[in-house]
Design a protein with these regions (language model features):
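A short, polar/proline- and glycine-enriched secondary-structure boundary/capping micro-motif
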Residues: 26-28, 154-156, 209-211
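Beta-propeller blade signature
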Residues: 93-105, 156-171, 212-215
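Residue-level detector of conserved, well-ordered beta-strand and adjacent loop positions
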Residues: 112-113, 179, 211
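Loop-centered beta-sheet repeat module
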Residues: 151-204
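Acidic/polar loop patches that form or flank catalytic/metal-binding clefts of enzymes
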Residues: 174-175, 218-220
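Short edge-strand/loop segments of extracellular domains
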Residues: 205-208, 212-219
């Protein structure tokens, strides 16, 4: 992944966010695009120091390889939500969500932060498999995918959010598991009228999946 970026619509414009936490507003008019930087504190949530095994990663070189950083953005009701890999110290990581009201400057605050972590000392640790896709869900909540970082046992454990799709309350960050047994779900969409969601994920060597959850009754 070379400095991946994410976009979503806000009114008639786009907000364009790089994996390194730089945000631009993109105005579309007369077949021309104009970009203007948006001041924010987003980069403050991202890793500034790296362990030796990841020493080649440099967020401030746009051509460097980055396995951490922002994983998705989602805009709804004048708020922007961003998922990212949070550093909990002592070589522990997991996927978290922050939010900001959309104003001239974006001040992000923590919305959801897991209580379990994945250690980078694990032999097969892979931050690429972190999920992070965000979509609207019902009852004033979001859907978030969280990968298992190649800790395969976590996907079936109800004590871990890894290898799961969870719903998160937009106001207080409370969450519940709505689907488990995933590897690295990255595609996600919810269909409100029919009340079901679809997720996709990569298999290790082929074997990609499309999963339908058609019974979300009682899930919030």
């Amino acid at each position: 992944e070379v400095n991946t970026a994410y976009i979503d619509f806000h009114n008639e414009d786009l907000l364009y966010t790089t994996k390194s936490g730089i945000i631009f507003r993109v105005k579309i008019s007369d077949k021309k695009l104009s970009l203007s930087p948006v001041k924010s504190n987003l980069s403050e949530y991202l890793l500034k120091k790296f362990e030796e095994k990841n020493a080649s990663i440099n967020y401030y070189n746009p051509y460097s390889v980055s396995k951490f950083g922002i994983k998705d953005i989602h805009i709804d009701d004048n708020y922007i939500y961003a998922s990212y890999i949070e550093d909990f110290g002592s070589n522990l990581y997991n996927t978290s969500v922050i939010k900001a009201e959309i104003k001239d400057s974006l001040i992000f605050k923590k919305l959801f932060s897991p209580k379990n972590y994945i250690s980078s000392k694990m032999k097969e640790f892979s931050p690429i498999q972190s999920g992070g896709r965000i979509r609207n869900f019902k009852n004033d909540s979001l859907l978030l995918t969280i990968g298992e970082y190649r800790d395969r046992s976590a996907a079936q454990s109800l004590k871990s959010v890894n290898g799961k799709i969870i719903s998160i309350n937009k106001k207080n960050g409370g969450y519940r598991i709505v689907s488990l047994g995933h590897r690295n779900p990255q595609g996600l969409d919810y269909y409100n009228e029919e009340d079901y969601y679809v997720s996709t994920e990569h298999g290790p060597f082929g074997g990609d999946e499309i999963n339908f959850n058609i019974n979300t009754a009682g899930q919030k």
